[in-house]
Structures are given as C-alpha cells and as structure tokens.
Swiss-Prot record:
Signal peptide positions (record): none
GO molecular function, one term: phosphatase activity
Lineage, opening ranks: Eukaryota, Metazoa, Chordata, Craniata, Vertebrata
PTM sites of type N6-succinyllysine: 50
Organism field: Bos taurus
Name this polypeptide is given: Haloacid dehalogenase-like hydrolase domain-containing protein 2
Coiled coil: 47-71
C-alpha cells in the first residue's frame, strides 16, 4: 500500500451507514456536521439501485442530512456512463424508481443487459429474456454484485445472486461498475484533487465498501450498522483499517487520530 499522506477526503456509504430506509443511524446527522466542520472533503458513494439520485437526495433531506446532489456518486451514474461509452441499448433490470437516471437512453430492441436491484423484475420470464439476449452475445453490465443488504425487516437478497445466476447460465462474465470496483472509487474522487492515499472510506459492507476502498489505496473503516454481521471484519485481507460501532464513532476516530 502506498505511503500515507495527510487526510484530505472522506467517502461515506449511505444505506446502512447513514440511514436504513427511512430511519437515520442514531447521531449520524450531528456526526456529519462535525466532519464537515473540518478541512476534509466529504463525498457520498452508494450502490443503491432502488431509486434515482434525486429520490435518494430527497430521502436524505427528509432525514435532515446536509447533502447536495453533486456530492453523491452512485453506481447508477457509473452504469449510465458505461452504457453511453459502449453505445448500447440496454434491457434495464432496475427498480422503476431508478429509471429517471437513464432518461434519454435508447432501450428499444436491446442489445445489452443492465442489472441492478429489481425485485419486481426478478421472475422467470424476465430473467429468461435476459438469458437469451446474453446467449446472443449481448454484454452483461452489473450495477453491483452485493450479496444482500439491510432492510428494516431484516437482511434481503441483493442483485449479486441474480447476476451470478445469469453468468453461470450463459458462461459469461459481467462487467461490474459499482463498489467494490477500483474504478468506481477513483471516479468518486474525480474533481476533488485528492488521491486515494489521502482518503478514508466509511461503510457497513466489509467487501464492497472497505475491501474495495482498500484495494484502491484508501483506508477503510467498517461500521457495525446496516448489513454488518459478527466477524465480517475477518472476511477480507488486509483487514479493515478500523472497525467501530457506527458512523459517529468513525467520525470521532477521524477527528481524534487522522487530522
């Protein structure tokens, strides 16, 4: 890992770290204010595919988080960027609430498959349609491959198992655009003037948040909220830079030890 420099940026996961659905993690709003009172740049990175960036921003504002749209980098944005780069017409397996982030993208007569978290679309007929497109040579673009995520009623399947099923059935490999891909983290830093060695990532997913960030050259702080399960910190190598109870505790550590 590269030599550490003074901390200049903090990347923060959203779902499971700052909030769980429509409930904020206790103390998270005040902790964010304390972090913003420092000289570090704060950006928010999320794999959520359940809603558009605008809907997500409105949810966060209702929870009284001081966040602006240009501070959020989503895997939906990364997926749209790749679709435009490849100039393909995607079959969009995403939640209907996420469709505004693909406004203007041509989807008739699809020649690619883009898959995120879309429970209402994950049934045999739709998946079989995607399967046939892939057999005909269409590329498979996974917005992310999370195994599961946290809802108020407990853990729930993420898109990863469905992406893997399509990979297995078609003997193909998906291009993943969200966390834990190194390019996702580097893209999130674009325009900040900050390097990975000057950055800390805070999240509740040991692999996608912490492991991905550390593979990109950042430090990773794992919080025990959201989807965290006991001993998650032992599932990645190198281990998280720090494992702590929640986002406010992570901010406490940053203020006391990294600035």
């Amino acid at each position: 890992m590269a030599t550490r420099r003074a901390l200049k940026a903090v990347l923060v996961d959203l779902s499971g770290t700052l909030h769980i659905e429509d409930a904020a993690v206790p103390g998270a709003q005040e902790a964010l204010k304390r972090l913003r009172a420092t000289s570090v740049m704060v950006r928010f990175v999320t794999n959520t595919t359940k809603e558009s960036k605008q809907d997500l921003l409105e949810r966060l504002k209702k929870l009284e988080f001081d966040i602006s749209e240009d501070e959020i980098f989503t895997s939906l944005t990364a997926a749209r960027n790749l679709v435009e780069q490849k100039q393909v017409r995607p079959m969009l397996l995403v939640d209907d609430r996420a469709l505004p982030d693909f406004k203007g993208i041509q989807t008739s007569d699809p020649n690619a498959v883009v898959i995120g978290l879309a429970p209402e679309h994950f049934h045999y007929q739709i998946l079989n349609q995607a399967f046939r497109l892939l057999l005909d040579g269409a590329p498979l673009i996974a917005i992310h491959k999370a195994r599961y995520y946290k809802r108020k009623d407990g853990l729930a399947l993420g898109p990863g198992p469905f992406v893997t099923a399509l990979e297995y059935a078609t003997d193909t490999k998906a291009t993943v655009v969200g966390k834990p891909e190194k390019t996702f983290f580097l893209e999130a830093l674009r325009g900040t003037g900050c390097e990975p060695e000057e950055t800390v990532m805070i999240g509740d997913d040991c692999r996608d948040d912490v492991g991905g960030a550390q593979n990109a050259g950042m430090r990773g702080i794992l919080v025990k909220t959201g989807k965290y399960r006991a001993a998650d910190e032992d599932k990645i190598n190198p281990a998280p830079y720090l494992t702590c109870e929640s986002f406010p505790h992570a901010v406490d550590h940053i203020l006391q030890h990294l600035l």
